Amino acid sequence: MYILVWKEGQQIRTFQDLEECGQFQTASNITDGQIFSINVTPTMSKGGETGETQLRRLMYLSASTEPEKCYAEYLADMAHVATLRNKQIGVSGFLLYSSPFFFEVIEGTDEELDFLFAKISADPRHVRCIVLANGPCTGRLYGEWHMKDSHIDNITKHPAIKTILFQIARSFSCMWSYLPKNAANMLLLGKNPNKQAPEPMSVVVTFIYLVEFSSILAHPGQTEQCADILAAFVDACVRNVEGTGAQVAKFITGICIAYWPINRAEDALIGLQQLSEDLAELRSQQRPGSALSLIYSRCGVHYGRALLCNAGFRKADFTLLGDCINTASRITSLSVKLKVPLLLSFEVRCVLGDEMREVLETSGLHKVKGRDQPVQVYQFNARELDSAMVRAKIEQLNPGSYRALCPVKPYESLLPAQRPPIFDDTPRENQPKLSQVQRRDSLVDRLSLIAKLAFPTSMMAGGEGQLITLTYISQAAHPMTRLDLASIQRIAFARNESSNITGSLLHVSGLFVQTLEGPKGAVVSLYLKIRQDKRHKDVVADFMAPSEGREYGSPLDMTSATEEMLTSFPPLQELLTHLAKPFISLETYVPTTVVRYLTAGNNPRNLQPVSVEVVLLATDICSFTPLSEKCSLTEVWTICKTIFVAFIRAIFNEGGEVIKLIGDCVTAYFPPTGADKAVHACQEIVTFCAQLGDAFHDVLDCRSVVACGVGLDFGQVIMAQCGSLGMTEFVVAGEVSARVMEVVALTREAGRAIVITEPLPDRLAPKLRDTGIIPCQEGVDGVPCYGNLGPEWELDVATIKKNIYGFHDARALAAMKKVDVGTNAPGRGAPAGGIPSSPKVRPPGRTNSVSSYTPDPNEALDPPMAESVFLDMCHQRGDTANNSIAVKLRQAANDDRLDLGRMLQGPHELMPVMQAIKHLTNLRMLNMSDNFVVDNNVGELVESCIPMRSLQVLDLSNNPGLTKVIALKRLIKHNTQVREFLLNGTRIAPTEQRKLQSSMNVNRLCASTDLKGSHKYEH
């Protein structure tokens, strides 16, 4: 076996042969790797006759397709075949059946498990194979194949085990397809997604728009088919995006956000082109009247640094943060104007291969919202996609007799028992009241509040005496001893007996799984008290539904996992642990409507698509682009994490439902009768931001300049679940979904932090309607708008931007002072490489003009320092250093050439690189081609090149953001040895390039008569 170690031991990978190891090292551009050869002696002999060098354990859950046949004889035949097969290939494990679910664990080598699981997945006797755990193991737990007596009835007669196993497995199986891929992957690794730290990464991001979907939603004749359109769109996106190595970040109303790693940029474009072709084929196959004939996609692609992070409270989501996400959205919007189906930025072009670059066509420089500088974009030679043409087709389509596969029905037309639980009907009398201090201070930590219990619609009419069953899962706050468990049983027994409640409590590996039976009022009251018990945490309701009779005769049947029942079959304990522990995280990421429907004992796949009127809320951070583009990714995450917790809490406290977390934006909806509560939630959100600024007023913290705008609109939306079993989305979509985002944008123009549209004032309480709002001069789509009255609800965008720029300047100045203090301290020299903490701040006597540049006497330039300067700068910015660049800088310290062509992973690496190469005074040739050099930063690159007294060649080719030569002329003036600039692939005019060459020729002639030592850096 061969082991490849790189990144100073932080990354390790094993290979079976040396050739495979070398190919991986070359393909991954690993220059600092070391290869070790080792011999591994197998330590496990059970389970196979062949020697095994590494073991893996895989656990999965599936549902039987024929549960009525799963009797003892059926399972015995299955056991006989499985035992012979697995003994032959060297696999051990166990199989447990608890109707209608199979639970299986298999152990073996990678090759054996991959082969076996591929066959298992294709077996028609079960469906929905969900991997619960898959990772390396140090030894086998099961020396032989445990199939004998593996039916749950032969293992235990205890009703608690059978009931709990069924309920958890059912919920887990249903929720899995709704999980974000990142959360699912972390659960497979045994990690809690809620506890994961943010991960910076270089990604190719795309926004895929369903063209003119808002027009389809607004067309009264096509509302019934909207669920079909969304389902087809989701399936097509998942198939082409995940099929090319990407991950779907999220679906919004007719929009898919996805991202690829940097080395899959070409695959990204191929997948997006294939998506367009698949939709074209789908359109051609439709019958007359089908709205599926109107599906077109439009994509914008951008490349940059982003932060994958987990944010939220009660309702969380994995989201991508960063300036590149906003830019990708703007590029997609720009494609509407340019009438192209696929538009990509210059940064994406930089990471493509030469063959794909040749087929690209430039679309010029364009100004986009939120960016000071124009964006260079490119396109393929494809057929024009005009939104006006699609809109005309939508208006002309006549459904006729065509009937949708998943028809959308009005919410009010359904019987109460048939309505999906889309609104929070929690009885407010069960919710704890806030103290006066808590009501006054919205910054107070309210994490200790009880999460509201969502009641299924089927239970609302049963009365307090209705018999119900409730099962919950929680984690022990500390290890439980036998004395602790005995105390819990003694107290709970007496309490349950007095309330006419029966049930069971199972303790397994630090987890509690309890079932309560009894009158609804008593069970709910007890459950709310149990949630506040400090001996456990992460309490999640798994099942709550009416019951026809009691299953348990005792007030509390306490069962410990250490008792004979689990000891007789050890796999059962492991299975319960792998099911219950991840389930605690599931509820946070799955849509609330799905959780409610599932908790009531229903199958979420049967949710009826409905159209319903709602109050829609959207809020985002004002001037987030200028705030985020000068903050580190970690700071951006800190901002969003802080506001998401407060925003979501305010929405839930007023009875709203969170739809999505989108970058810095949160969307939510309230019932049509909840206009007042929606306004109160808006006020709490705005108040929180104001108090946040006050809390950090005297501290240089990025949260001190946060302000937000909130928009409220009223209209009809469609709620439906879309997608295959592989990935399912619960979508809230409507014309109002797009309009409410325009209402949020209107808050800036109107100067009001809260803006509501015309339908809402009539739904407000008289006092708030008559004295709390004023008309706005502007409107949205001809609809009048109103803003909240009062100085505390004013929104001054100019002041907000001034505060943001002032914050950046103050922090840069503070960092510069810190460097100066370190430089001038007695007995101390200059900081490493003389790195300024903020590249935008110059020491006294220096300006942005290269022509007036003079060397800093305290700046010690040393070629061996280049690598450490680069690493230090990356660390200061909170970024992960590019090890390939670090190795190149280390090698260049002893050479006169530095080739960084196409080495940078994004513009964020330019500043550390430019600070580092300043130390390479020995260079004669510098290659910075394809490295995001534009007019805005070429001046600083030139400044870094001035100390290179012998520099002769500077390669800036394939940087189309370059249009001016003035900075290069200044370099010629200071460095008389420069004889060539390579500018192919830039946008510098040929005439300017010829003038530049003439300047170099003249400069060299003049320099031949100069005295030696005339260079700026010769002392």
UniProtKB/Swiss-Prot annotation:
Signal peptide: none annotated. Keywords: Cell projection, Cilium, Flagellum, Repeat. Residues 846-855 have a biased composition (Polar residues). One of its GO terms (molecular function) is blue light photoreceptor activity. Residues 825-839 have a biased composition (Low complexity). One of its GO terms (biological process) is cyclic nucleotide biosynthetic process. Residues 825-862 are annotated as: Disordered. GO terms for cellular component: motile cilium. SUPFAM superfamilies: Acylphosphatase/BLUF domain-like, Nucleotide cyclase, RNI-like. Residues 204-332, 615-744 form the Guanylate cyclase domain. Belongs to the adenylyl cyclase class-4/guanylyl cyclase family. Heterotetramer of two alpha and two beta subunits. The FB strain is deficient in phototaxis. It is not known if this is due to defective adenylate cyclase activity or defective BLUF domains in this protein. In wild-type E.gracilis, photoactivated adenylate cyclase is found in the paraxonemal bodies (PABs). PABs are not visible in all cells in this strain, and are smaller than in wild-type. This is Photoactivated adenylate cyclase subunit alpha-like protein FB. It comes from Euglena gracilis.
